[in-house]
Amino acid sequence: MTVLVGLVCSDGIVIGSDSSATFGPDIAHKTIEQSVQKVFVVQGRIILAGTGQVGAGQRFTAAVDAAWTAKGFSKSHIPTDFAKTLANIGIEDFASTKMNHGCFGALAAFPVKDKLCLCELALADFQPELKTKDMWFASMGSGQPITDPFLGMMRRIFFSDGRPPTLKEGLFITTWALMHTIELNPGGINGPPQIAKLAFNAKGDPEARLISDDELEEHKNSVQAAEKHLCQYREILNAPPAPADPKIPVMPPQ
């Protein structure tokens, strides 16, 4: 059980997940649950987070790391080429052990020249789809039925002008979406949230990193403050109606 959230921001990319892994012989028979790492940074440049078989995620992360070291992305000069290279790395590795389709999907963030990109590698067939500034969020995993409507509401309320969020806004929304899903899911998705960001550093180089516990706590506090502010709207709804303005009598002409 997993929830993944990815956002394209005006100045970066955010990917987050829950922290829960379930044990058991199959999806219908679970034994125990524990906290694990689900969001990974490869070579300080790529962010990966997967849903599905844990072993497939381990293999995919290792294969991407090896490909980067071997300059396997050197010919990927446009985002679609980089995304196809990621897909091919995974598909070829999975095929080597005859893994069936539908066992693993992922979100990936990566730089291509002066662009920062978010790609969804579909659970059904691992085919890549780039997210854009018009379609700037994605979610995957068993928590998707909760996160998609929530993210859609965030887009409608905060970004009705069509612009994507800033990185700071994206970290806030990702944290809120993960906390919301962790709170409401029927089982198998638990905290704490794990979040990584890809952005250009002060030198102008792309840099991917996991946010620190202190940074996560700051965003969680912002979410709690927003929820408290929303809750206070009840006072407005339940307030007595304002008294009507007194009518000023009209004096007859003299």
Regions found by a protein language model. Give the residues of each.
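Conserved short S/T/G-enriched processing/targeting/catalytic segments and their helical context
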Residues: M1-G102, F126-F172, P186-G187, P206, ...
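Conserved phosphate-donor
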Residues: K98-N100, F104-E120, P186-I189, P193-F200
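Short Gly/Thr/Asp-enriched flexible loops that form oxyanion-binding sites at enzyme active sites
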Residues: L123
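Charged C-terminal helix
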Residues: M179-D213
